[in-house]
């Protein structure tokens, strides 16, 4: 019995840490974008419950991307990511109170967009042929 337990523990230790690839990042960003846009649309419609649900989902989608940036030693990207997550948390909190202040949540949503834009300015570029966005090659070095 002890031998089986030792073998299981040893095998578990040998299992490599999951890798968050460029394809994973691309997929996360492509699903995150519409959710973030949906936050703004829901706020504009005064649909705070849907906006809150989109904030929660957006945060989940964005948070996992930290592995990509950490694995590449991009501390500035991790800082930008944490800023965006903190702003999403603030918007979630503002949407969780009984009487929601539309101006406050609008300001917080704008601040989330600013955090996204700050990272995208550094790490994203538009393909001149397809017009699709992609990660700058410098982010991979």
Residue ranges of each PLM-predicted region?
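Bacterial N-terminal signal peptides
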Residues: 1-8
């Amino acid at each position: 019995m002890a031998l089986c337990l030792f073998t299981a523990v040893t095998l578990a230790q040998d299992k490599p840490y999951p890798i968050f690839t460029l394809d994973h990042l691309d997929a996360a960003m492509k699903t995150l974008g519409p959710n973030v846009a949906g936050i703004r649309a829901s706020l504009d419609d005064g649909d705070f419950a849907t906006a809150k649900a989109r904030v929660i989902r957006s945060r989940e989608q964005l948070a996992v991307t930290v592995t990509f940036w950490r694995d590449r030693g991009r501390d500035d990207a991790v800082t930008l990511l944490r800023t965006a997550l903190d702003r999403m948390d603030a918007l979630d909190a503002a949407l969780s109170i009984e009487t929601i202040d539309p101006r406050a949540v609008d300001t917080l949503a704008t601040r989330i967009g600013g955090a996204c834009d700050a990272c995208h300015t550094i790490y994203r570029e538009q393909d001149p042929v397809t017009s699709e966005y992609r990660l700058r090659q410098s982010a991979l070095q």
